[in-house]
């Protein structure tokens, strides 16, 4: 009787483990993601984005989060990058070099001549490794009008 009870309990536990959903491991985790909007008295606007992202997998490092994309229109907007660096797992800091800021035409505007004035800043994050944290702080300032 005790043996049968033991087997039924073990079978129930195993079935529960199969049926209950499991939490998948994260590719990356945001430690901080802040988007703030400021409307100034002269009518200009500032959108500031601050993010800290820790990478846990090679897929996150090489494909998903290895680059950040910022779309803006230089005819009436200004992009200001306040800070961009990577803190490696051992604590050392790798500043983003100047050649890691690449300005391109957004892919959505490729076949639309009316939108060829748009720009996309591609920030290529350097010094990435498993456990590294990306820090990016930038503003897009829109002129009044």
Q: How would you label these PLM feature ranges?
A:
Residues 9-19:
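Bacterial N-terminal signal peptides
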Residues 1-10:
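Bacterial N-terminal signal peptides that target proteins for export
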